[in-house]
C-alpha cells in the first residue's frame, strides 16, 4: 500500500511519472484528482470538516507529515475545508512521492 511506503530523495534529475503511471497510482487513491497548473501536473484533493478548528488541526497534521517525509505540499486552509496539492517542485511534475504522501493524508483522516 502506498501509505506504508517512504518518500525517496527526489533531485532535479529525477524522472517524472508518465501519464500512464499517474493513472495507475491514482487508482490506489480515493477522491484525488490530477490537475494542471502553470503547465505542471499536480495531485489535488479537498477535505471537508465541520468547522475551522478541525480543518486547522488537519492542516497541522499534514505539515508534520510533510516534515517527516521531507516533501511539502500546497495547503489551502479555509472554514470547513482543506485543499491539499502535491507535486514535485524539483522536477516540475509528479513523482511517486506525491502519491505516497497523498495516501498518507488519507490515512491521517482515517486515524481521527
Swiss-Prot record:
Classification via InterPro entries: PCD_sf, Pterin-4-alpha-carb_dehyd, Pterin_deHydtase
Highest taxon above the source species: Bacteria
Gene3D superfamilies (UniProt xref): Transcriptional coactivator/pterin dehydratase
Keyword tags: Lyase
Catalysed reaction, written as an equation: (4aS,6R)-4a-hydroxy-L-erythro-5,6,7,8-tetrahydrobiopterin = (6R)-L-erythro-6,7-dihydrobiopterin + H2O
EC number assigned by the record: 4.2.1.96
Keyword field contains Transcription: no
Enzyme class: lyase
Listed GO biological process terms: tetrahydrobiopterin biosynthetic process
Transmembrane segments: none
Molecular function via GO: 4-alpha-hydroxytetrahydrobiopterin dehydratase activity
Protein family: Belongs to the pterin-4-alpha-carbinolamine dehydratase family.
HAMAP family: Pterin_4_alpha
NCBIfam families (alphabetical): PRK00823.1-1
Protein known as: Putative pterin-4-alpha-carbinolamine dehydratase
Amino acid at each position: 500500500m502506498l501509505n506504508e511506503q517512504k518518500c525517496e530523495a527526489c533531485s532535479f534529475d529525477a524522472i517524472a511519472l508518465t501519464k500512464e503511471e499517474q493513472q495507475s497510482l491514482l487508482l490506489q487513491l480515493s477522491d484525488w484528482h490530477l490537475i494542471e497548473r502553470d503547465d505542471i501536473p499536480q495531485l489535488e484533493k479537498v477535505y471537508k470538516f465541520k468547522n475551522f478548528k478541525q480543518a486547522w488541526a488537519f492542516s497541522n497534521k499534514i505539515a508534520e507529515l510533510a516534515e517527516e517525509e521531507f516533501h511539502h505540499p500546497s495547503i489551502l486552509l479555509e472554514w470547513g475545508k482543506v485543499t491539499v496539492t502535491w507535486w514535485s517542485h524539483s522536477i516540475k511534475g509528479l513523482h511517486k512521492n506525491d502519491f505516497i504522501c497523498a495516501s498518507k493524508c488519507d490515512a491521517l483522516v482515517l486515524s481521527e
